[in-house]
Amino acid sequence: MIEIKNYQENERFQHHFNVIRANAPVSYGGLKLYNGKRDYLIQSTNQFAATLCYLEEYFKDKGVQYLEIGTASNLTNSMIWNSLNIEENIILDNLECPGTAESLVGNLSFKQNTVLIVGDSTQDTIKEKVQALGYKYNLMLIDGNHDYEYVTKDFEYYYRFLSNDGLLIFHDIDNDAVPGVRKFITTNPILNTNFTQCANFIDNSNYLNKNTFGSQCGIGIYKRK
């Protein structure tokens, strides 16, 4: 199982860490204070730096067809875009997260071959739009509604669009504030029967107050067996 420690001496890890730290809020290990807008990167520094290193190592220069469920400020999407060769960038979001409009529009503006589908990812109309695109994705991030029922619905519908060699990422697998994700990854029979966890990026260091939301997070990366 790949962990954060596998990358911490890596030059790329330090690069990603520095960029994430500059754009993430203090409660996530970053340097930003709240300014009334949600224009910050909603990622824990060490965890996401290790994730980007893993993805770069896995895909190298290969073209990536990426499906992102939940985008908020779109900064996670931008970090992945800047790190990989994204050929198709499909994003689902209901746009109900407040204060993200300026960051979302600004970040979307420079990404060719991006499709933003607005709506609830669990609704039939949205599912039909994704199906109509006809893509198979070799990278998929499930980071929308974190309630157990919604994570289950997102996974059990969209995993069928994952290619055989594709990677599936879950955010907040170790976050007590949103326990539905942890419950899902430990109990879902389809995930546990058909997928293997390749990477477990959970940060147990003490540089953050463990009562803060972003200090927990946790990122899990899975691949079909």
Residue ranges and their predicted role:
Residues 19, 23-25, 29-225:
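S-adenosylmethionine/decaboxylated-SAM
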Residues 1-17:
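N-terminal auxiliary segments of SAM/dcSAM-dependent transferases
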